[in-house]
Amino acid sequence: MDRFARACLIVNAASGGNTPEACAALSDGLPAHGIVLARSVAVPDDELPTAAELDAGGIGLVAIYAGDGTLRSALTWLEGWSGAVLVLPGGTTNLLSKALHGDRPFGEILAELPRMARARRQCLRSEAGTAVIEVLAGPGAKWSDVREGLREGDVAAVASTAVEAAQASAGGSTVVLSRPEIGKPEGYSGIRLTPTSTGIEIEGYRAETIADYVAQGMALLRRDFRSGPHEELGLYRQIRLASIDGSPIELMLDGERGRGPAALRFSLAHWRSIC
């Protein structure tokens, strides 16, 4: 068990169903369990704290109440810090929080702080960055742009980006698994990588019909990947992906858009201080 005396709280009030009332309740919840709230950070307006700033303030715990994308940014920013990160369900999908704590609300999670211990968590490393939950590589990652339009309530943007995403899934540069050489030689419109304790779980998504593209797109919007048409390709300790025509690889890292070079190697690594 870890004893945390002082904490920093990172919130994104615009993430998921977060409300000012929920953020205020969380701010009160830490002191209620004997932890001094030494610093509060509201993203994206405030800058994330550095490891040196946290250490100087005697802060040993960072609690993150935000979506998966903000969580990934904070974890990447704090990589190498000796303190602990508490993951709370503050977004829409909350995949990492669910993996660690189930579907419990943050109040129940906070109540366990006096008995909570840090966990080793597998993550994925590549030249494009670190992902703690999942990676989607290929033109299918463009469906994330549609999801962003849905977040902002921009109907026109949703319509136009949905058309672009469907066209990209149908005719964009597919991605192949080159090391090891597995899966379809013509590649996939989306390859999903998930870190597990036994290896990188690999799934390939290659829709063959318009109906398949619609089904796949809806699955991507919900980040419910397994409900879309896909192939399970096995478990590997590391994997190399390459675009079939040498163009940059479109990416979705923990639900957030990115882009990598024409070839990318992903390998397992550990995050030691998540709770």
Predicted feature locations:
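A short acidic Gly-Thr/Ser loop motif
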Residues: 66-68, 91, 269
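Catalytic core of DAGKc-family lipid kinases
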Residues: 10, 40, 80-201, 206
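Short, glycine/acidic-enriched capping/hinge loops at junctions between secondary-structure elements
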Residues: 19-23, 50, 74-75, 97, ...
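ATP/NTP phosphate-donor binding region
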Residues: 1-65, 72, 76, 80, ...
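ATP/nucleoside-binding phosphotransfer catalytic cores, i.e., glycine-rich phosphate-binding loops
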Residues: 204-275
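Short, well-ordered alpha-helix to beta-strand connector turns
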Residues: 4, 59, 82, 188-190, ...
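Flexible, charged surface loops at secondary-structure boundaries
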Residues: 1-3, 54-58, 125-126, 169-171, ...
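Short, solvent-exposed amphipathic alpha-helical segments in soluble enzyme
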Residues: 24-28, 79-80, 148-149, 218-221, ...
